[in-house]
């Protein structure tokens, strides 16, 4: 799936090898670099030497492994990013580069005009891991790295929350 986020940023390609991560918080003064740095720090703990650019993308060896977008609504801030773990990069590139043969790889796709994305060479995180790992294990480690941080907490939706979401 190829989508554009309402929160900005470039086009986003989704498949089962792509991890989506969001931070939502109530703050007076958002610090998007703080959220970005948490992801970079996790990757460092996983043995991946990653770095961020001024557009809040994350790179390894000059290849992009994560893009992000941010938005503010009233006193709520949302930072979200994609992590390319084991994405089909051929299909991703065909979709994002407007390959005329993308329709055969992406049934139901269609062309549309939008603000162009900033192009970057991409890579999968799994290429940089010192030991093989599947996406479920990686997500487990990622989740626990945030949960174990005292600054972060889990919010569990109540039945009332779920009803409001469904409306």
Pin down the residues of each PLM region.
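Long, positively charged amphipathic alpha-helical accessory segments at protein N-termini or as interdomain linkers
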Residues: 37-49, 66-68, 73-167
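N-terminal lobe of the biotin/lipoate ligase/transferase fold
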Residues: 1-30
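A short glycine-rich, hydrophobically flanked beta-strand micro-motif that places a catalytic Asp/Glu
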Residues: 49-59
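A structural signal for short, well-ordered beta-strand segments
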Residues: 21, 56, 81-83
């Amino acid at each position: 799936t190829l989508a554009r986020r309402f929160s900005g940023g470039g086009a986003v390609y989704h498949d089962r090898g792509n991890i989506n991560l969001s931070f939502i918080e109530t703050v007076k003064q958002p610090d998007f670099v703080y959220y970005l740095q948490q992801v970079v720090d996790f990757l460092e703990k996983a043995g991946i030497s990653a770095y961020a650019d001024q557009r809040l993308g994350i790179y390894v060896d000059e290849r992009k492994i994560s893009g992000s977008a941010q938005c503010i609504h009233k006193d709520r801030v949302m930072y979200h990013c994609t992590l390319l773990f084991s994405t089909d990069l051929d299909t991703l590139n065909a979709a994002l580069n407007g390959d005329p043969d993308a329709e055969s790889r992406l049934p139901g796709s269609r062309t549309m005009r939008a603000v162009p994305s900033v192009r970057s060479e991409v890579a999968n995180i799994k290429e940089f891991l010192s030991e093989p790992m599947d996406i479920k294990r990686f997500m487990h480690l990622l989740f626990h790295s945030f949960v174990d941080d005292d600054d972060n907490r889990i919010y569990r939706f109540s039945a009332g929350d779920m009803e409001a979401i469904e409306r």
